[in-house]
Curated annotation (Swiss-Prot):
The chain crosses the membrane at residues 18-38. Cleaved by the prepilin peptidase. Disruption phenotype: Deletion mutants can no longer assemble into the pillar-like structure. GO terms for biological process: protein secretion by the type II secretion system. It is a single-pass membrane protein. One of its GO terms (cellular component) is type II protein secretion system complex. Core component of the type II secretion system required for the energy-dependent secretion of extracellular factors such as proteases and toxins from the periplasm. Pseudopilin (pilin-like) protein that polymerizes to form the pseudopilus. Further polymerization triggers pseudopilus growth. The gene is xpsG. This is Type II secretion system core protein G. Residues 1-17 form a propeptide. Type II secretion system is composed of four main components: the outer membrane complex, the inner membrane complex, the cytoplasmic secretion ATPase and the periplasm-spanning pseudopilus. Forms homomultimers. Interacts with pseudopilin tip complex component XpsJ as well as XpsI and XcpH. Interacts with XpsN and secretin XpsD.
Length: 143
């Protein structure tokens, strides 16, 4: 019978795992990656909301025009699209739901009669809800 000797590997006492510094570096790197990815994702959400606001304003303008076709006049306020205004014959609404009178950021869409160079203006004040601004804070107007 042949005997084989089993040899054991040398002790790994010097390799106890990762040091505290290595763990901190890994956590910092993971945090940096998550910050970068998060900012990209949130930026995409704002871009989507801006595009939705443009589309919503165009749709709301069509509803205002339907109101005008039915009643012979423009609504005095956007709420007239939701509930029939007093003394308004020919109203076949509601033309809009209350939620449609707010932009994707939850701000009330501004409606002005007469408009600046047109019959009416519809304006979303953007992400910050204030006039002016740049990027996603800029105003979105009906053209």
């Amino acid at each position: 019978m042949i005997k084989r000797s089993i040899t054991r590997s040398p002790s790994r006492a010097g390799q106890a795992g990762m040091s505290l510094l290595e763990i901190i570096i890994v956590i910092v790197l993971i945090g940096a990656v998550l910050t970068l990815v998060g900012s990209r994702v949130l930026g995409g959400a704002d871009r989507g909301k801006a595009n939705l606001a443009k589309s919503q304003i165009q749709t709301l303008a069509g509803k205002i025009e339907n109101f005008q076709l039915d009643t012979g006049k423009l609504p005095s306020k956007l709420d007239d699209l939701v509930t029939q205004p007093g003394g308004s014959s020919g109203w076949l609404g509601p033309y809009a739901k209350p939620v449609e009178l707010n932009d994707p950021w939850g701000h009330t869409i501004e409606y002005r009669v007469p408009g600046d160079g047109q019959a009416f203006d519809l304006i979303s004040l953007g992400k910050d809800g204030r006039p002016g601004g740049s990027s996603y804070d800029s105003d979105i107007k009906y053209q």
